[in-house]
A protein has these predicted regions:
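Catalytic Walker B motif of ABC-type/P-loop ATPase nucleotide-binding domains
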Residues: 188-191
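ABC transporter nucleotide-binding domain
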Residues: 207-301
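A short, flexible loop at the N-terminus of ABC-type nucleotide-binding domains that lies
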Residues: 24-31, 39-53, 103
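Conserved catalytic motifs of ABC-family nucleotide-binding domains
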Residues: 184
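Conserved ABC ATPase "signature" region
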Residues: 130, 134, 141-159
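Conserved ABC ATPase signature
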Residues: 163-167
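Conserved ABC transporter NBD signature motif
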Residues: 90-101, 106
């Protein structure tokens, strides 16, 4: 059993009373609150600032993605919030409990699925889940019932008697998530949950995660460098780079506010393209205009309405477009706008 998942809380009666208190809490405060959270590491004679003053709130029931390249500070932030790392400075509360002063209560309030496989290779799948329940202070009977529930929820029932070492990568990740949910935590951290999985396995895993969230109302915070994952799954995206939060909003708002739509228009002459560019520069929604021969490239908010106005006004001045295309922005465009770097290229460079 991996220490990533069993975080070392007490299994005493007091711990179980604390758990009852957690479950009875109202919605009077955020599920996660951090203030100026930092983490520094000594690397030889050099001091590495992995996390630099992260301040954020996550409401109960939210699904939030921490997006950034490898080495941005995402996993370090999660490890501090799960009490696996002590912050250098700053503070944080989980379900109202301080991560430094109430470690047992914090640990009972969350499930954590790390990047590595958390289950013991020689254990049988169902036995691993039962053992996890016992470590949380559950009775053997309750642990067995909960194990069977999770096996069914994550389509692992037929694999319950198999050794963990015989599972496929996707099956192991589903087991990891089951381990994180044994004690029905109100908060689940997923650290790069689909790294290394093929697209079909990733989609299957997300189907399970989203279904369980709908049924249980669990708050989920995940780290990922998969842009599509953050864009399509998360209700809110927090972009982290070099240990700092550089953007925080819905994916739709980030793309609209920071990147904008890309309009590409072609004309029958360079003169006509120049006329269209001149018109575009006068529109308040247009952010950038570039002309290359008879092609005009525009970055603009509200791309559809901008294009309609642009085509009408350019045509009135004798510049009729031959073609006009709109490309919607991606979260990589957002990262590029914020940092001058591509998130895909940054992630690939670190990985290599």
């Amino acid at each position: 059993m991996s220490p990533q998942l069993i975080l070392g809380w007490s299994t005493s009666d007091q711990s179980r009373r604390n758990w009852g208190h957690i479950m009875s809490r109202g919605n009077d405060r955020p599920m996660i609150e951090t203030k100026a959270l930092t983490k520094h590491f000594a690397q030889g004679k050099k001091l590495v600032e992995a996390v630099k003053g992260v301040t954020l709130d996550v409401a109960e029931g939210e699904l939030v993605a921490l997006l950034g390249p490898n080495g941005a500070g995402k996993s370090t932030t999660l490890r501090m919030l799960t009490t696996l790392l002590e912050p250098t400075s700053g503070s944080a509360r989980i379900a109202g409990f301080d991560i430094a002063a109430a470690r047992n209560e914090v640990r009972s309030s969350l499930g954590y699925v790390g990047q590595g496989n958390g289950a013991g290779h020689n254990q049988r799948v169902r036995d691993e889940l039962v053992t996890q329940g016992l470590c949380y202070g559950m009775s053997k009977g309750d642990s067995q019932v909960r194990a069977d529930e999770l096996l069914g929820d994550l389509e692992l029932t037929d694999l319950g008697t198999r050794k963990v070492s015989t599972l496929s990568g996707g099956q192991r990740r589903r087991l990891d998530i089951a381990l994180g949910l044994v004690h029905r935590p109100p908060l689940l951290f997923l650290d790069e949950p689909t790294t290394g999985m093929d697209p079909q396995s990733r989609a299957n895993l997300w189907d399970h995660i989203l279904r369980l969230r709908r049924e249980m109302g669990t708050t989920i915070v995940l780290t990922t460098h998969y842009l599509e994952e953050a864009d399509s799954m998360a209700e809110r995206v927090i972009v982290i780079d070099e240990g700092t939060v550089i953007a925080d909003n819905t994916a739709t708002a980030l793309k609209a506010d920071l990147a904008g739509d890309h309009l590409l228009l072609t004309f029958d002459s360079t003169d006509a393209a120049g006329v269209a560019a001149s018109v575009a520069e006068q529109l308040v929604t247009v952010r950038e205009v570039a002309v290359d021969a008879n092609v005009v490239s525009i970055r603009a908010g509200e791309g559809d309405s901008t294009l309609t106005v642009l085509l009408r006004q350019a045509d009135a001045r004798g510049a009729r477009a031959l073609t006009a295309d709109i490309t919607r922005p991606t979260l990589d465009d957002v990262f590029l706008t914020l940092t001058g770097r591509s998130l895909r290229e940054s992630a690939a460079a670190v990985a290599s």
